[in-house]
């Protein structure tokens, strides 16, 4: 594994309980890489992301992510792994009874931050990165869908993760708002973090070109870097 490699899977099999979802999974992802995961519903995209997050155990094969060996990881190590990962999902999962600032403060305190000045500074930093520096006082219901997803991205950045795992982050958003989210994720990748994004939105895939892997018939296939054939992808 090279110095720049941040994720590596070797001959891995991905399971949900006893059900084999993907087999012979082999790939590496480097720092600053942006990688799409595509495929039909149920093809294994989310299961692969959950394996990276140690939500699903790696039962066969080998994998290393952010310096943690997934096939040997112990339960007490999982919280430390997850501090190196920023998670962005389609459903925003914000605490609806707390303001934006309070949502972010909750995560920081839960991960060991206790100095108020440091907490306030970090919240300001991540909100500025996503263009919401003046929205910290608002409640989630006062924000648009795109703004709520920006808060989720800000939340994912709080502990300065090495990797962003995004599962359908634009799934509930209109095209213009989706492009804004993609611009933010692209900037995050350019800042040195790896970004892995599962998506069905092939229009974004075509507009924001990046390395693409497809879950298909129980395998993970690397697609050539060429003009994307939408009809072929839908098969």
What are these regions (language model features)?
Residues 175-177:
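Helix N-cap at the start of a conserved alpha-helix in ABC-type nucleotide-binding domains
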Residues 158-162:
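A short, proline-enriched helix->beta-strand linker immediately N-terminal to the Walker B motif
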Residues 53:
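Helix-to-loop junction immediately C-terminal to a conserved catalytic motif
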Residues 164-167:
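Catalytic Walker B motif of ABC-type/P-loop ATPase nucleotide-binding domains
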Residues 61-69:
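Conserved ABC transporter NBD signature motif
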Residues 139-143, 147:
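Conserved ABC ATPase signature
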Residues 97-106:
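Short coil-to-helix segment of the ABC ATPase nucleotide-binding domain corresponding to the Q-loop/switch region
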């Amino acid at each position: 594994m090279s110095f720049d490699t941040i994720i590596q899977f070797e001959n891995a099999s991905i399971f949900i309980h006893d059900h084999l979802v993907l087999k012979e999974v082999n790939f590496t992802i480097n720092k600053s890489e942006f990688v799409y995961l595509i495929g039909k519903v149920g093809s294994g995209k989310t299961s692969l992301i959950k394996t990276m997050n140690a939500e699903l155990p790696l039962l066969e094969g080998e994998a290393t992510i952010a310096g943690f060996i997934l096939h040997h990881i112990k339960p007490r190590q999982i919280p430390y792994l997850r501090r190196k990962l920023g998670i962005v999902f389609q459903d925003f999962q914000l605490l609806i009874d707390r303001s934006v600032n309070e949502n972010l403060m909750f995560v920081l305190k839960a991960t060991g931050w206790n100095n108020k000045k440091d907490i306030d500074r970090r919240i300001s930093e991540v909100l500025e990165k996503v263009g919401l520096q003046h929205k910290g006082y608002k409640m989630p219901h006062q924000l648009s869908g795109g703004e709520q997803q920006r808060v989720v991205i800000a939340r994912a950045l709080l502990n300065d993760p090495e990797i962003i795992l995004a599962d359908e982050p634009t799934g509930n958003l209109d095209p213009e708002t989706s492009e804004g989210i993609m611009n933010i994720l692209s900037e995050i990748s350019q800042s040195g973090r790896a970004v892995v994004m599962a998506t069905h939105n092939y229009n974004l895939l075509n507009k924001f070109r990046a390395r693409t892997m497809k879950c298909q018939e129980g395998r993970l296939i690397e697609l050539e870097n060429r003009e994307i054939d939408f009809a072929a992808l839908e098969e």
